[in-house]
């Protein structure tokens, strides 16, 4: 799951798998839902690995896709990272495309965070182990275009 804390102090929780992403509000105790979880509408080829962040007043939902029919076969290039944008933390979402190509791992999960004015994309690959099921943590700089779209992340090995 992913927990996102909005600027107004409201917490949201997201989870997903099997092609469905859901999100909902959390109560102040951070232990209970404040209402029902709802399906996040507008995502394209969602698989798993939901992450939410906010940039210039817009909400960004990033996730791993399932574009390969043999997605769990251990072949390089099984999952790309997509993102969608919304005016609300619970959507509806507008799919914007892919911001990261597949790694050499059988899957990819990512997060996007700002640190000291620079945005970063965290993800994993198999560069250290050379086995697609053993994940190595990676981080690269992430950049936005003037219109708020995310540039493709250049993966450095």
Range-by-range predicted roles:
Residues 1-157:
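Carbohydrate-active catalytic/glycan-binding domains of CAZyme proteins
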């Amino acid at each position: 799951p992913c927990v996102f804390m909005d600027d107004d102090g409201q917490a949201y929780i997201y989870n997903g798998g099997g092609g469905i992403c859901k999100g909902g509000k959390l109560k102040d105790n951070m232990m209970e839902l404040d209402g029902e979880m709802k399906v996040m509408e507008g995502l394209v080829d969602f698989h798993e690995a939901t992450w939410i962040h906010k940039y210039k007043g817009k909400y960004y939902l990033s996730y791993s896709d399932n574009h390969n029919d043999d997605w769990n076969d251990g072949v390089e290039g099984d999952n790309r990272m997509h993102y969608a944008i919304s005016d609300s933390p619970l959507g509806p979402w507008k799919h914007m495309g892919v911001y990261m190509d597949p790694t050499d791992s059988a899957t990819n999960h990512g997060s996007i965070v700002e640190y000291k004015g620079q945005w970063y994309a965290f993800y994993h690959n198999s560069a250290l182990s050379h086995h697609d099921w053993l994940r190595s943590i990676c981080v690269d700089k992430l950049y936005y275009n003037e219109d708020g779209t995310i540039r493709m992340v250049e993966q450095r090995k």
